[in-house]
Amino acid sequence: MSQKIYFKILRFDKTHNDHVYLPGENSVENFQTEGSCVPGRLYFCDPSDPKQNICRYLHYGDVLVDITLPTNDPDFKMIVDPSGTKCCANKIIIGTERELSDPETFAYMASHGVDIHKNYIIHWAFKNFHDRVLFYLLKTNLNENRLRIVEHIFKNPSSLISNRNYNFYIVNFLQRFKKHLNSLTDNQYSDIITNLINLSNKIIEKYFEDMTGNKNFGLDIPEKDWCSYIIENDLDKGSISKILDWSFKNNKKMIIEYVISLFIEDYHYLEKIFSLSCKYHDSRIAEILIKKSINKERCLISACEAGFLEIVECLVKQDVNINLLKGTPLVTACQFGHLLIVDFLVNNSADIHIRDNAPILYACRYGHVDIVDYLIGKGIDIHTVSSQALINACNRGHLNVMELLVEKGADIRSVENILVVEACRNTNADILRFLVRIGVDVLSKGVEPLIVACERGQLAIVQYLIDIGIDICANDNEALIKSCRSGFANIVNLLIENGADVKARDNEALIIACEKCNHTIVTILVSNGADITARNNEALIRACHNEAVGKYFIDFLIEKGADVHARNDIVFDFIHKLFAGNIPKSLKFPFSKNQSDSKLIH
């Protein structure tokens, strides 16, 4: 038997092309001596022949095995494949095997003459997530070219990965590889390595968000791999929380319980996990955590927020004080609209009047009309809460709550001014119509409702106010001026169509529009008679004082009739600065500084 060592790559199951390889002697019948890469041969590589680099075949398997040849056997046959890249025989002897994920395997190859510094090996190591091998390959032959190859891969990692679930393994691989890179920063390639670390962080962030943000991602990844990922990569609590959220979505109990074991002494974080268990209505995990030494009052609030009645009942049975923390459990249930929990808490002595009737005020603010009705039925005095309750409902646009409050006797008179203005502010023409329908005199509130609607760009409300007869020219056309300042061209147009005076306050609306450099509004105003030269050319001067103004806006104003000769020095200085002294003939600036005659500046 020959003592020379040859190499072969095999999978963990030791199969290839329907042939099962066993330790010791392996053979084939009908050995083929003709052709290249044909069945009926046992292939292997000679490490002493550079053309037969075993690393070409890394993608064929998981382990490297030593091959020796039974040269003393009279039936033994061997040839070099016509491709020249491998040998083949009818009989081989398989010896020691070494895993390709181990850097020592590559050191062993190199000791037998294999060139392990081929660039394609770097790609293979990345694609198979062998971080220790990749680091070994770089460290043993560190140069800029090889680092640039890694950099290129990092910039487009998906080019090597076809399976979307591999995102998990990419992130895991990069977390580990980044630790290796940190040990290389003190050398002549430190800038490149630092960039690789930064690229790693970006890829990790991107893929991690994709992993944890997609409910269907990674369902076939073993839970033990997720657990290993958490402990091996020193993840912060924010990242762990994202994994937990994904785990609850997909009912991955092993991961959740593993994280609980990691934070068994961190009661604050256990409360966070409890909140997630409530969010996903996972009673088993919630009950596990309740048995820990966590704050049960805060847990009750989490259960109320999530609408998890089963756990609310469980905690109340354990004599948790439902009126502690200023009655937050009931207030929370009212805020998030969980009527069944509100009913349960009230029937278990929760104080509906706590914190100056906060429960009903929160229900009004968040639009839960069924809870508002329930609390009134349980004894809330509508006259005590009516003002703030109406304001809360109006602020958020909850017309149905306002209708219920009025039906139950809420006094709207004391707050009708506030309600009118808030309805105009919050884009709710339906509430405004409701107020008019129940007798509120909107027109008696002055111009403020119109001003608020114009400032907020509420076109439908402005139209409604015009329809019911509001004076759009009040306060010397303040509504038009506010609309120009806020930049709502559609409202400017509507006001002008209904009689607003574009020249009010000596063309203030146009001057403000020029100050804001609003082409559309300036065009509307000028086309409706605004004087662009008013106040000694103030519109152009205001535009010149706006640092964001563009060259073509100035030309636009001149085309509209702005007088460039008025206040010559101010306009010249601005235009000269804007064009860096090189004013093109295509723009119409027919003057120069300190000259009264018209000369084009070149």
UniProtKB/Swiss-Prot annotation:
Instruction: Please name the Pfam families in this protein's record.
Output: Ank (PF00023), Ank_2 (PF12796)
**SUPFAM superfamilies reported in the protein's UniProt record:** Ankyrin repeat (SSF48403)
Keyword annotations of the record: ANK repeat, Repeat
Q: Tell me the SMART domains matching this sequence.
A: ANK
Q: Which domain of life is it from?
A: Viruses
Do the record's keywords include Zinc?
Answer: no
Chain positions of ANK repeats? 133-162, 269-294, 295-324, 325-354, 355-384, 386-414, 416-444, 445-474, 476-504, 506-534, 536-566
Q: Which PANTHER family match?
A: ANKYRIN REPEAT PROTEIN, GH09064P
By what name is this protein known?
Putative ankyrin repeat protein L100
UniProt organism field: Acanthamoeba polyphaga mimivirus (APMV)
